[in-house]
């Protein structure tokens, strides 16, 4: 199975059954509802949040409770922010936060950045090097490449990769849900799917730089105020 997009730099797969991860997924659902309402068909962000929550095994009951349940005072005060960071060796990092205490976020993040030997970047100076894409990993379903291309000919695709275990279909964001629906209708088993920011260019870090980034990443994963990070390291 092609794994380059699945494994890379967002929520770490080792946290798949971690309560902290589920807490962050639930928080994103609540934030999406606050902004756009409870209908995922008209709330693009909520639809993406539900899709991701299901991918990481958050139960449907928990999802529904976070959509329709009463919010508490802390939920109502959640503030979103996105920080762009320059790291060592040309590393570019985007950090998304969701917190009721922005001062705490800045204080914590400055500490992580200092240990990384990085610096805060101006808005869009890092993000310009990323592109949102829909990533769908499937089984082969007895399809060869040409047959799959014919099945998806009406949709805007970025790329299709395959190996002996399955396909990796990469779409533009607007085509993601329709492509996924088409694949499911054709009998494909979806192993993993999500919308995510993908680097347009990757950098190769030295072992020392990679160790610093791993510590930075672990700090972010363990921070309740940080929803996710992406970076352009290989």
Curated annotation (Swiss-Prot):
UniProt protein name: Probable transcriptional regulatory protein MYCGA1330
Chain coiled-coil ranges: none
GO biological processes: regulation of DNA-templated transcription
Keyword line: Cytoplasm, DNA-binding, Transcription, Transcription regulation
Species of provenance: Mycoplasmoides gallisepticum (strain R(low / passage 15 / clone 2)) (Mycoplasma gallisepticum)
Family: Belongs to the TACO1 family.
A single GO molecular function term of this UniProt record: DNA binding
SUPFAM superfamilies per record: YebC-like
């Amino acid at each position: 199975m092609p794994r380059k997009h699945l494994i890379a730099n967002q929520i770490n797969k080792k946290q798949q059954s971690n309560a902290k991860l589920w807490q962050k997924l639930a928080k994103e659902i609540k934030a999406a509802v606050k902004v756009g309402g409870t209908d995922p068909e008209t709330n693009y962000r909520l639809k993406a949040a539900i899709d991701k929550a299901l991918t990481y095994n958050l139960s449907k009951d928990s999802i529904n409770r976070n959509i329709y349940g009463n919010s508490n005072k802390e939920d109502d005060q959640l503030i979103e922010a996105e920080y762009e960071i320059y790291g060592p060796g040309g590393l570019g990092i985007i950090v998304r936060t969701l917190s009721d205490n922005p001062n705490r976020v800045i204080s914590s993040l400055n500490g992580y950045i200092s240990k990384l030997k990085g610096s805060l970047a101006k808005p869009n100076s890092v993000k310009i090097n990323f592109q949102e894409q829909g990533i769908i990993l499937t089984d082969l379903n007895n399809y060869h490449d040409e047959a799959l291309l014919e099945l998806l000919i009406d949709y805007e695709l970025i790329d299709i990769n395959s190996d002996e275990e399955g396909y990796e279909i990469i779409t533009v964001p607007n085509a993601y849900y329709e492509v996924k629906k088409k694949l499911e209708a054709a009998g494909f088993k979806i192993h993993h799917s999500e919308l995510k920011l993908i680097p347009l260019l990757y950098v190769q870090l030295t072992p020392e730089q990679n160790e610093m980034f791993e510590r930075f990443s672990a700090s972010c994963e363990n921070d309740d105020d940080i929803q996710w990070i992406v970076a352009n390291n290989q």
